[in-house]
C-alpha cells in the first residue's frame, strides 16, 4: 500500500501528508504521527489540516495518547467535528457537532486539556466542552488521518508550572528505572 506519511512542499511550505486511501484491510488502522511522552499533561495542542477527501474517513489531532491505539482524538468525520476515544479498533464517540468542512480550506484545530476537562475548537470557535476520565492520564500529542490529508504544523504548549511538573515526573520515573536496573548489573 505504500507509505502512510510523506513530507511534501508547496509554494515553499512543508506539509506532513497522510497518503493511504484505505485503512481497513486486514484490520482497521489509524495512521498517526506522535510526539511527546506519557508524562505530558494539561496542555494545549494546535494543528492545521487540509483534507483531500471529504466523502469518508477522518482527520484530526490526537492527545492524551499512550500510543496510536489508545488516545483521544478531535477530528473531522461525516460532516461533523467529533471527540472520540480510540482504544485498539474500537472508537467511542464522546461528543459531536455538525460541521460542513470541505477539501478547499485549511482548518486550525485546537484542543485544551486541563485534568479531565477538554475544550475543542475549529478556527477559534469552541465546538466541544466536556469532562472525560480519558483525559486524566495525559500522554503524547499526535496528528492522525484515515484519508489523504496535509498537516501544515503542530504546536503543543504548557505553562511553566506544568512544564516543571512534567519534568519532575519524568526524572522520578528515570530514577526508579535506574534503581531497578542497578539490581541487575550484568544485564
Task: Say what each PLM segment does.
Residues 163-187:
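Activation corresponds to long, low-complexity, non-globular regions
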Residues 30-38, 61, 95-101, 130-131, ...:
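Beta-strand-rich interaction surfaces with strong enrichment in secreted/lumenal proteins
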Residues 130-155:
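Flexible glycan-contacting loops in extracellular carbohydrate-active proteins
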Residues 45-47, 104-122:
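Short tryptophan-centered beta-strand motifs in secreted/extracellular beta-sheet-rich domains
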Residues 1-29, 177-184:
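Extracellular glycan-recognition surfaces and repeat-rich motifs
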Residues 87-108:
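Short, aromatic/His-centered strand-loop micro-motif at the edge of beta-sheets
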Residues 20-91:
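Secretory/extracellular carbohydrate-interaction modules
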